[in-house]
Amino acid sequence: MSVPAGSVSCLANALLNLRSSTDYNADHGVKNSILNFSNSKDASRFDGSESWSSSVLDKNQFIVAGSDSVKHFVAISTQGRGDHDQWVTSYKLRYTLDNVNWVEYNNGEIINANKDRNSIVTINFNPPIKARSIAIHPQTYNNHISLRWELYALPVKSYSNPSVQVGEVSIGDRSLNSGTGSRTIVRHVKFPVEFLSVPIVSIGCKKVDAHTDNGQMRWEGKSENITTKGFDLTFITWGNNAVYDLTFDYVAVEFNN
């Protein structure tokens, strides 16, 4: 599986801080965990193993990458240790939006990982994971818990804060101009561009074409069933009102932190 086009390598570009549960020693730390890391091979300036390696071999080990800013992660790649036959064969992921409360990815799904030293295995996130920090928890391994990895995120310009889309929607076909009592008609609104997370939608009526019921104007609009792709606008009237048309403006706003 390939990395989504246009995504940013977070670890290689030092966009995230790294921490681990344990390190085998100072030469096997998180600084060596970047995908494709290779040591100098010069004995006079040995710069460590070609991976992060834990000092304890159990399912409580982890390596976490995080920051205080929200990112939309689109993929993760893993790789084994380049200078020994050690690699993680499966793992779980956990992530957090507030750096306090953690969530297991896909309800604790065990993700198949590597089978050799240097092959790269990539998993894409669809939809993207909105988080400040992500942790990888090795579950099974070959010889030792050792890995190199990379996290990929959307570039900042792809999700400016806040993201806003506007538009209008009308009844359009006089569906509510006859009959009595409660009557409704629904119009589905599709956003021009899909949001990354469910936005807040506000509506306001800008045009009313209707006949009163004994001097009373009875109509209402509601935004419902809001998703990242759109929402339903429900037009309502009641009594003896005849509503020929209503037009609403909408503003959809996505906040990312």
Curated annotation (Swiss-Prot):
Pfam families, alphabetized: F5_F8_type_C, H_lectin
One of the record's GO cellular component terms: protein complex involved in cell adhesion
Modified residues (Phosphohistidine): H84
Gene Ontology molecular function, alphabetical: carbohydrate binding; galactoside binding; metal ion binding; N-acetylgalactosamine binding; oligosaccharide binding; polysaccharide binding
Tissue-specificity statement: Maturing spore cells.
UniProt binding sites for a carbohydrate: D209, R218, W238
SMART domains: FA58C
Positions of the UniProt region annotated as Beta-sandwich: 1-155
Residue span of region Linker: 156-162
Residue intervals of the F5/8 type C domain: 10-154
Keywords: Calcium, Cell adhesion, Lectin, Metal-binding, Phosphoprotein
Binding-site positions, Ca(2+): N39, S40, D47
Region (Lectin-like): 163-257
Motif segment (Cell attachment site): 81-83
Listed GO biological process terms: adenylate cyclase-activating G protein-coupled cAMP receptor signaling pathway; cell adhesion; cell-cell adhesion; cytoskeleton organization; response to bacterium
Function: Galactose-binding lectin. May be necessary for the primary process of spore formation and may be involved in spore coat formation.
Assembly mode: Homotrimer.
Protein name per Swiss-Prot or TrEMBL: Discoidin-2
Species of the source: Dictyostelium discoideum
